[in-house]
Amino acid sequence: MSGTTLLIHDLEAAVSPKGSGPLRGRDLGELEVCSPASIAVSGDRIAAVGPPGEVLRDHPPGPGCETVDGRGKAALPGLVDCHTHAAFLGDRADEFELRCRGAGYEEIHASGGGILSTVRATRAGSEEELRAATERHLDWLLRHGTTTAEVKSGYGLDREAELRLLRAIRAAGDAHPVDVRPTFLGAHTVPPEFSGAAEYVEFVVAEVLPEAAPLAEAADVFVERGSFEVPEARRYLEACAGYGLALRLHADQFSERGAVPLAVELGARSADHLESTGGEGVRALGQSATAAVLLPACALFLGLPDPPARALLEAGAIVALATDFNPGSSFCSSLPVVLNLACTRLGLSPAEALCAATANAAYVLGLEGEVGRLSAGYRADILLLDAPDWRYIAYHLGGDHLAAVVKSGGLLPPG
């Protein structure tokens, strides 16, 4: 009896990053394109991708196998959003209007708005309200083809609220088709009840981290003026590493503060943002295993300089893309929009952008070999595009060409 449980047949093309592991530097954008193609799925895994005749011969559909007609469609790996703040309550529409009238993001933050505005709204919510809101935000991500997403805490900033957030993130992930990887962003900014960053970090390390660590897979810190400098970030990250958490850093968003050298020194999985990163930081990332996660929707939303994507690639860096979805500085839940911005503003090709939001984003989350490619043995997370060319996912700004989503081998219902 055949083990094939889903057969997607006669696709125009199946498109996937080449090889295994992250694609560095100029290798970003190396694709395997099979045209025409069929994909056989067994359970939650891809069994084969190849010419239709070969796939049908080697993986014939058995009793109960679901079949999908792929004619006129292209298959891509499910997108991986490796940097989101999707667990929050409230919004910051009023602040958006203030910025439209000329107020700066840092100015709003310094006056008690920004992150702290969302902290107040999030602290006031119940765990059930947070779970429901996170699931709603995951719906938005999935609608645009994201099948795996990192979700950070960081809008609680006290013991009970941070733990409540992490529990809500995990509960939302358990209930939702999108695979959720939780990150403890205990050092997002300093809440007003603390006198300074050093005092707050000691509180987090002593009172929050021991209970937060089992609920998370990674830890993150915002290294920036007005938030945390390198000494506090080092203290926090080294403590988190002691609990086995992978390390992430918000780095060089508004100014260079030494975050990139710290990320490389500590072997962090990623340094994210990098709008202000100079030549030394670019070279350091190019020689390291720390990925550069670029967030062009945030740069656009705040009117910041674009991160140095091509310089990072020329230096040999591992470049990934993400939405930075959050209510204040990047209210964007669409990775295809980010792919377009990566092409039009950062100078990436559509192939480079696709690889950065699949294989390399999977690497950031420690999921290389699991998601981000259409290859035998990988999880069967597959997007079907109804478009003349697979590049429409980046080319058509705001377009809606997603015909179907397969998640862990199951065809999801429309919408």
Curated annotation (Swiss-Prot):
UniProt keyword annotation of Transmembrane present: no
One BP annotation, GO: L-histidine catabolic process to glutamate and formamide
Q: Which domain of life is it from?
A: Bacteria
From the Swiss-Prot or TrEMBL record, state where the protein is found. Cytoplasm
What EC number(s) is this enzyme filed under? 3.5.2.7
Pfam (any one) = Amidohydro_1
Enzyme's top EC category: hydrolase
Q: Which cofactor does it need?
A: Zn(2+); Fe(3+)
Pathway of action: Amino-acid degradation; L-histidine degradation into L-glutamate; N-formimidoyl-L-glutamate from L-histidine: step 3/3
Q: Which Gene3D superfamilies match?
A: Metal-dependent hydrolases (3.20.20.140), Urease, subunit C, domain 1 (2.30.40.10)
Q: Which InterPro entries match?
A: Amidohydro-rel, HutI, Metal-dep_hydrolase_composite, Metal_Hydrolase
Tell me which UniProt keywords the record has, alphabetically. Answer: Cytoplasm, Histidine metabolism, Hydrolase, Iron, Metal-binding, Zinc
Q: Which residues bind Fe(3+)?
A: H83, H85, H250, D324
Q: Which reaction does it catalyse?
A: 4-imidazolone-5-propanoate + H2O = N-formimidoyl-L-glutamate
Please give the family membership noted in the entry.
Belongs to the metallo-dependent hydrolases superfamily. HutI family.
Role this protein plays: Catalyzes the hydrolytic cleavage of the carbon-nitrogen bond in imidazolone-5-propanoate to yield N-formimidoyl-L-glutamate. It is the third step in the universal histidine degradation pathway.
Stated name of the protein: Imidazolonepropionase
- Source organism per entry reads Rubrobacter xylanophilus (strain DSM 9941 / JCM 11954 / NBRC 16129 / PRD-1)
